[in-house]
């Protein structure tokens, strides 16, 4: 019984990474850009219907909802070879098309105005599923639509579908560069509050680290958006392989999430992928064994989140799930796990078992690959809190001077005061404190002392 997943793509960033994700899924399942199954794609071992459904004329349509407050990106998708893939009824563009002006408050209050139209689409998709498992939301936390409308949708999805899982792929801004969005720290913090309170699982895609990986590992001087988005779509498709090529374990979303998230608030995951290649660099083929792949996944340079070095806190893994694709002998996996434990290659929490799990998955039979084995690590690691700390520091700088707040004051939510900003700051601080507490043996009783 397939547990379907509906993908919601929001704003410029969400629609761009979503577009790459669907391109990747079509290639892996042998589906043409028009949604027709290719003649060679006859092996019936994959499960397409988690992410696609079939129209009356047999062609496959993504269970995707494309939302944006300005038309540019969605128009470029509709002018691409993949225009006929999507269900046109599932595309929502706001009528005035002015966007959210990189302003969280504008995105949020536009969400309030248009939520009926949006939920008509989402409810229709949900009703068309046999047993909907949940939603996947793609967005960035820095702009206006992805952050503001994204926050609004996260709150409403919890109200309307309290039993459904909500997983997000959230793109964090590049902190090495000056941002062209001056209110980015406000947008990020307001969105982080919703990601903490309203999502079950957040896969953090950190632009700082993605740019670093593209430069250092793939040797691209100035990585373009599309190259970074290709990295992201690799992670997104790899993290869903066990759903699409089901094995015995981890063949639904809750199985993936349950093994990684033992305590509900600490649900921000980082990812690592190896071996990384872009099209040109396939020449650099190394031997890939399971141990190689698993050891490389633990190296910080392959992890797609840039975490600051925090000497005071002894950061550690809460849980790891490695999704290994390719020709793998299961006994090798067991040996590799033993080696990792014996050599203490990973530092785990002091208050629970060293949870490192491995899910084996088939590779797509239709895509040539230069590597026998590739791996994706999804890890719950306490050092992700340093990403939130730097968001808070940037926010505090602006908030202290009350900089750029007049753009927010125009919207109802901030008309009288800025309590919502301060509340968000508190929620994120509590999240940081809990991640720090999770590095100590007494975390089990954490939260009971304070009440």
UniProtKB/Swiss-Prot annotation:
Keywords, sorted A to Z: Cytoplasm, Cytoskeleton, GTP-binding, Microtubule, Nucleotide-binding, Phosphoprotein
Organism of provenance: Bos taurus
Entry protein name: Tubulin gamma-2 chain
Subunit (UniProt): Component of the gamma-tubulin ring complex (gTuRC) consisting of TUBGCP2, TUBGCP3, TUBGCP4, TUBGCP5 and TUBGCP6 and gamma-tubulin TUBG1 or TUBG2. TUBGCP2, TUBGCP3, TUBGCP4, TUBGCP5 and TUBGCP6 assemble in a 5:5:2:1:1 stoichiometry; each is associated with a gamma-tubulin, thereby arranging 14 gamma-tubulins in a helical manner. Gamma-tubulin at the first position is blocked by TUBGCP3 at the last position, allowing 13 protafilaments to grow into a microtubule. Interacts with alpha-beta tubulin heterodimers; the interaction allows microtubules to nucleate from the gTuRC.
Matching SMART domains: Tubulin, Tubulin_C
Record PTM text: Phosphorylation at Ser-131 by BRSK1 regulates centrosome duplication, possibly by mediating relocation of gamma-tubulin and its associated proteins from the cytoplasm to the centrosome.
PANTHER family: TUBULIN
GO molecular function, one term: GTP binding
GO terms for biological process, alphabetical: cytoplasmic microtubule organization; meiotic spindle organization; microtubule nucleation; mitotic cell cycle; mitotic sister chromatid segregation; mitotic spindle organization
Binding site for GTP: 142-148
Localization terms from the record: Cytoplasm, Cytoskeleton, Microtubule organizing center, Centrosome
Annotated function: Tubulin is the major constituent of microtubules, protein filaments consisting of alpha- and beta-tubulin heterodimers. Gamma-tubulin is a key component of the gamma-tubulin ring complex (gTuRC) which mediates microtubule nucleation. The gTuRC regulates the minus-end nucleation of alpha-beta tubulin heterodimers that grow into microtubule protafilaments, a critical step in centrosome duplication and spindle formation.
Family: Belongs to the tubulin family.
GO cellular component: centrosome; cytoplasm; cytoplasmic microtubule; gamma-tubulin ring complex; nucleus; pericentriolar material; spindle; spindle microtubule
Sites bearing Phosphoserine, chain numbering: 131
Pfam families (alphabetical): Tubulin (PF00091), Tubulin_C (PF03953)
InterPro entries: Gamma_tubulin, Tub_FtsZ_C, Tubulin, Tubulin/FtsZ-like_C, Tubulin/FtsZ_2-layer-sand-dom, Tubulin/FtsZ_GTPase_sf, Tubulin_C, Tubulin_CS
């Amino acid at each position: 019984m397939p547990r379907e997943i509906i993908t919601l793509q929001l704003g410029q960033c969400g629609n761009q990474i979503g577009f790459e994700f669907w391109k990747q899924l079509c290639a892996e399942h042998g589906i043409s850009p028009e949604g027709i199954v290719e003649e060679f794609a006859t092996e019936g071992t994959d499960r397409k219907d988690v992410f696609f459904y079939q129209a009356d004329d047999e062609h496959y349509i993504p269970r995707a909802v494309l939302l944006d407050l300005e038309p540019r990106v969605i128009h470029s998708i509709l002018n691409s070879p993949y225009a006929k893939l999507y269900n046109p009824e599932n595309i929502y563009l706001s009528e005035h098309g002015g966007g959210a002006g990189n302003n969280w408050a504008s995105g949020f209050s536009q969400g309030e105005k248009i939520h009926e139209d949006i939920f008509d689409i989402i409810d229709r998709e949900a009703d068309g599923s046999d047993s909907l498992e949940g939603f996947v939301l793609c967005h960035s936390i820095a702009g206006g639509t992805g952050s503001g409308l994204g926050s609004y949708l996260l709150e409403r999805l919890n109200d309307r579908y309290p039993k459904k899982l909500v997983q997000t792929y959230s793109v964090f801004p590049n902190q090495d560069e000056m941002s062209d969005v001056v209110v980015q720290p406000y947008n990020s913090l307001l969105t982080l509050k919703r990601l903490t309170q309203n999502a079950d699982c957040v896969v953090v895609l950190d632009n700082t680290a993605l740019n670093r990986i593209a430069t250092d590992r793939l040797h691209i001087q100035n990585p373009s958006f599309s190259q970074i988005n290709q990295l992201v779509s690799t992670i997104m498709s790899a993290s869903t392989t066990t759903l699409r090529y089901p094995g015995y374990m981890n063949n639904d979303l809750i199985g993936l999430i349950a093994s990684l998230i033992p305590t509900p608030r600490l649900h921000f995951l980082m990812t690592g992928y190896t071996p990384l290649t872009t099209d040109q660099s396939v020449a650099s083929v190394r031997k890939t064994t399971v141990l190689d792949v698993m050891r490389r996944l633990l190296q910080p340079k392959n992890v797609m989140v840039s975490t600051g070095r925090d000497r005071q806190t002894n950061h550690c893994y809460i849980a790891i799930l490695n999704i290994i694709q390719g020709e793998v002998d299961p006994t090798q996996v067991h040996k590799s796990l033993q080696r990792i434990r014996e050599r203490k290659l990973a530092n785990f929490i002091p208050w629970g078992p060293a949870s490192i799990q491995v899910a084996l998955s088939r590779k797509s039979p239709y895509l040539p690959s230069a590597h026998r084995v590739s791996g994706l690590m999804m890890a719950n690691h306490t050092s992700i809190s340093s990403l939130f700390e730097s968001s808070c520091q940037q926010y505090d700088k602006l908030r202290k001077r009350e900089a750029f707040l007049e753009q927010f004051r125009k919207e109802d939510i901030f008309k009288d005061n800025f309590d919502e900003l301060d509340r968000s700051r508190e929620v994120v601080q509590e999240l940081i404190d809990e991640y720090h507490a999770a590095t100590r043996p007494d975390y089990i009783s954490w939260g009971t002392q304070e009440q």
